[in-house]
């Protein structure tokens, strides 16, 4: 069942490398948002962010293409894709470390007027506190773009005060 809703995930993409089973899964808050929007029936779903040029990046790209998530405004740069090391202890996921977003942590997405024009085509743009998109949020607000934002469960009061004025829907996962 399709709904006349369009959703864009803007920001992070990573692979979670589950060391105990030697398996790599695509993820990241913005990627997961785009995939689940599509799976839940959004008529249009897209992801916009920066990929590295390694096997991890290609895995995420292929997975998004398999899910029919639009990638038209993504960038691919030379460098490692975001990756985290994960295991499971007593049934709970435990993060062992990460490369801090890989190339995406070093080369931040800077929105221009063409990006904003594209983003205005969506009912909601979703980002989060691990997306490295904070400095672009005022541009989204000024353009009248509806923003949802996941603060996760480890943001500070100062961070909330800095980001909340640019957010229409806040989540704390």
Predicted features by range, described:
Residues 6, 43-46, 70, 145-146, ...:
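Residues at the starts of beta-strands that form the adenosine-phosphate
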Residues 30-39:
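Histidine-anchored nucleotide/phosphate-binding helix
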Residues 15-20, 42-123:
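Conserved N-terminal subdomain of the carbohydrate kinase-like
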Residues 28-31, 100-102, 151-156:
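Short, acidic/turn-prone active-site loops that include or flank metal/cofactor-
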Residues 1-22:
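Positively charged, low-complexity intrinsically disordered leader regions
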Residues 124-173:
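Conserved beta-alpha-beta core of the PfkB/ribokinase-like small-molecule kinase fold
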Residues 21-29:
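A short, glycine/small-residue-rich beta-strand->loop->alpha-helix junction that serves as a flexible
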Residues 4-5, 121-122, 167:
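Local beta-strand N-terminus motif with an aromatic residue
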């Amino acid at each position: 069942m399709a709904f006349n809703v369009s959703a864009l995930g803007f920001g992070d993409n990573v692979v979670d490398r589950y060391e105990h089973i030697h398996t790599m899964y695509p993820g990241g808050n913005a990627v997961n948002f785009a995939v689940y929007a599509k799976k839940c029936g959004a008529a249009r779903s897209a992801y916009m962010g920066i990929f590295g040029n390694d096997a991890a990046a290609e895995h995420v790209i292929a997975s998004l293409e398999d899910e029919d998530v639009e990638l038209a405004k993504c960038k691919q740069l030379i460098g490692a894709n975001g990756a985290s090391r994960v295991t499971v202890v007593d049934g709970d996921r435990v993060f062992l470390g990460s490369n801090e977003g890989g190339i995406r942590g070093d080369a931040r997405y800077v929105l221009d007027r063409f990006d904003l024009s594209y983003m205005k085509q969506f009912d909601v743009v979703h980002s989060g506190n691990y997306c490295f998109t904070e400095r672009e949020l005022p541009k989204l607000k000024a353009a009248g773009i509806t923003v949802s934002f996941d603060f996760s469960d480890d943001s500070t009061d100062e961070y909330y005060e800095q980001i909340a004025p640019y957010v229409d829907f806040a989540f704390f996962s």
